[in-house]
Amino acid sequence: MKYDVIAYCWNDALAGFTREDAQRLTHVNLAFGLIKDGLLDLHLLKYLHLLPKLREWNPEMKIVLSVGGWGADGFSDMAMTEEGRRNFAKSCLDAVEKYNLDGIDIDWEYPCNDAAGIGADPRDKENFTALLATLREYLGKDRIVSLSLIHI
């Protein structure tokens, strides 16, 4: 049986990534992109210029951008409308193409629940589903759309 070995890599850890790290993994999820004004915001990710080196070390490794994380606001408002979902998905596609990423991972903590101190709405559940469908539409069937979740 073949297993995937997936690691979340925080921005600063990317600077210390080694050839051995890259060769151990099938996937690396870069943490975290955020949402600002309804669009993908990469200002925290200062080491994206190192991604070609990771690809050189392990050409088969999938590199996925994780968006969100604990306390990351903006999902509920962005996903509330079709226009918001489309604008966000387009900004994700732009980043995927610019940085040669293999996909987007959504870490929305938590739809319908403001436990993390972020905006939430009872409609988040269906809007989350619509967001994932929109991401799939924009990224296409050959790119990764994944999510980190508990129960919704």
Predicted ranges, named:
Residues I6, S146-S148:
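Soluble periplasmic/extracytoplasmic beta-strand elements of cell-envelope proteins
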